[in-house]
Amino acid sequence: MHQSGSRTLSKEELALLRLFAFKVKHNLTEAAFNDLLIAFPGNDISSWQVTSRHIQCLSGFKPVRYDCCPDSCVCYTGPYEKYDACPVCGKARYKPNSTQLRSYFAYLPIIPRLCAMVANSRLAKEMHYRSQYEDESQEGIMEDIFDGDLYKSLLNKLIMVVGKNLPFHHFSDHRDIALGVSMDGVSVFKKRSKTCSPLLLFNYNLPPDTRFHMNNIIPAGIIPGPKKPVDMDSFLHPLVQELVQLEIGVTAFDGLSKTVFLLRAHLLVVIGDIPAVTLLMRMKGHNGFSPCHMCKIVGVKASLSNTYYVPLHHRNVSGSSSGPYDPSNLPMCMHNGFIDEANQVQFARTLTLEQNLATEFGIKGIPLLSSLGSLSFPASFPYDFMHLVWENLILNLVLFWTGCFKELRHEGMGYSLDDSVWTDICCISAEASDTIPAAFGCHVPDMSTQRWQLTAESWEVWTLYIAPIMLYGRFTEEKYYKHFRRLVHLLKLCLEYELLMEKVAKIENSFIRWVEDYERSVIKVMTLNGVLTCSNAFRFYYQHNISRLLACPLTIHALLHVGSSIRANGLVWTNWAFPMERYCGDVVRHVRNRHYLYIGINNYATSSAQLAQLKLRYDLDEELSFGSQDNDAGHIYDGCK
């Protein structure tokens, strides 16, 4: 017997759910689903149209459609609700001589799904992890996001909604839910001509070993392309409305105590790559005059370029009024200062003043997410470790070593590798990857011929387990190998499952030294004869040379904020984008119809979310998975016990 509250499923409804789960799991088209009526006559199979209506009723939620620009510039919510054309590109909202919309964003409400989670007795018990962790956590040891300073500060902070304090603190009830939100852009095709942007929520009340499983991730919708949004807040509007409701509290049923209570949820962290965080915080971006969203370091524009670079050492850089920055004492952005500057831009009296202030502050206006009292700007928006390190830092180092990093001179540099040497490294790395157990990560392809197959995970496997061996003795100057080995040691430290606070301080200081060495130039040394001379032994990539300014992108500077982000938000694996990458890969694999691309993507996101909801509401997790549950335990061989 399967039931939700007083609602009991009939045999016919259960058969309908199995059929629906079969369609979602095997990515059947609507035409293929309808053909089942012909292939299996007499089995009382309904058409897809009838089935989808039943599924909406049984799951307890359906997508809410919001009109949006056909280029996804804006979504017609909030201030744009009554617009008939896009305020950015001018394209019409509706088709000619019709009230039929041209494009839409299918938002998936999160409140019904959070209520289903706490109503499911099995999951509700797992969600006690957060409150139990508070009681059992050890002082001075960091093991989860709840050891971060931001979460701890919320425990003694009254909930504020629309400028008014409510008479209770954040997480005052053991059932209050800690949430994280993640956004990323994904290219649907290899040519990267069309993109879409999934919005996901993570339930941090679940234990770390299950919280990022696909069936526990909460999709809030997929923003259609073909371009990235210009006004991200217009797409966030329905989500923020629900998050404000959840701060106040919504009525829910406790599956353990069998009582009705007021469910609250609070957003702890926002996860995304640099472009995504730029949109979510309404900042100018990584090419702005002040490109870092964590501190106020001033960028330096390279000649014949509109891009600003951020070396610590600004001396001898034309047009720069800043001296060398102290990496241990950077001019950090604080919440009150950020909001004050955003207000100045938002309410500037003239357009010219608004543009000047936006350029000076690097902020375009007040972000909609600032209406949530649980977020701190910019501390709640850490640099994503996955994108920062595996998809940018390591790739850039490889481009240096192969002489392909931008328009810099690489000939004669001690880090430069001959083509034959690099080809040999790539070939042996791919062969070595065949012998690495899959538990360590995915296969590493031949990077010289199959670089397009490289993912963040394969970069990680190569960096941590293969590169330290493959690169030994390859550089003409050994200092570059030692510099890389120091980085690998640091990355392994960041990936530990628990950290003493002393190690967090070590991470901060070690990244400071690594970045300083990355920028370092020749230094003057005293010879035995008492004569000052210049030594090249300490010259690395930037070399304090204006002609090499391109060697200092934001992704190098961002390493200086990894340690402080761990202090604020917990260990890097608690808020990185790997779960988002897995979801994006799942979306791309389910693309079937190129003509109705975004309709198909929305339909898949909706169907998979409804299937997860049905499993929760009627306790059908095993039955609707057809026995193919995730098994992370693996097999333990007798000789390894």
Task: Please report, for each region that a protein language model flagged, where it lies by residue.
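Acidic, metal-ligating active-site segments
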Residues: 156-157, 161, 165-166, 171-225, ...
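Terminal interaction-prone segments of large eukaryotic proteins
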Residues: 296-297, 395, 403-641
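Short, cysteine/histidine-rich loop/knuckle motifs that typically chelate Zn2+
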Residues: 68-71, 88, 294
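Compact, glycine/acidic-enriched structural inserts
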Residues: 204-251, 303, 495, 619
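Domain-level detector for long, ordered catalytic/regulatory cores in large eukaryotic signaling
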Residues: 82, 91-156, 236, 244-456, ...
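N-terminal alpha-helical interaction blocks
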Residues: 1-66, 75-77
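Residues immediately within or flanking Cys/His clusters that coordinate Zn2+
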Residues: 63-66, 70-72, 83, 289
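Cys/His-rich microdomains that often coordinate metals
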Residues: 73-77, 93, 296-299, 584
